A protein has these predicted regions:
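TPR alpha-solenoid repeat register
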Residues: 43, 50, 77, 81, ...
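Alpha-helical segment of the N-proximal tetratricopeptide repeat
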Residues: 3-28
């Protein structure tokens, strides 16, 4: 996710705060981490998850999409983001949109698995 010690410490703090029900403090830690690594898709994903848990569905969708914009070929984080989008759409009453998002997540998960298998075969040669 990150090799930056400050970012790792902020992620740990965000998790501790979230576990303690301090979602605002968790969000502040994630936002600080994003100021250090603004193009880190995993940080955007973590913030999207937090906003989803807070019931901020439109914000969660926006953040998940932003994460995807920085994800490149990181299919796992893309799949996780599409799951956030799907759950937000369910909560918004958009069943059709949720189904599409869950399908996209599943497709990306398969793509990530296929790439992992291909890489394992390449390294075994």
């Amino acid at each position: 996710m990150s090799g930056n010690r400050a970012v790792i410490a902020l992620l740990d703090r965000a998790q501790t705060d979230s576990d303690a029900g301090q979602s605002e403090a968790a969000g502040a830690s994630l936002e600080r981490a994003l100021r250090i690594e603004p193009r880190n898709p995993w940080l955007w994903f973590e913030l999207a998850q937090l906003r989803l848990a807070q019931g901020q569905y439109a914000q969660a969708i926006t953040l998940a999409r932003k994460s995807n914009s920085f994800s490149g070929r990181q299919y796992r984080v893309q799949a996780e983001n599409w799951r956030v989008i799907a759950r937000a759409r369910v909560s918004q009453g958009d069943a059709a949109g949720a189904d599409q998002a869950f399908k996209r997540a599943s497709d990306l998960e398969q793509q990530a698995g296929a790439e992992k298998d291909r890489d394992a075969g390449f390294h075994a040669q």
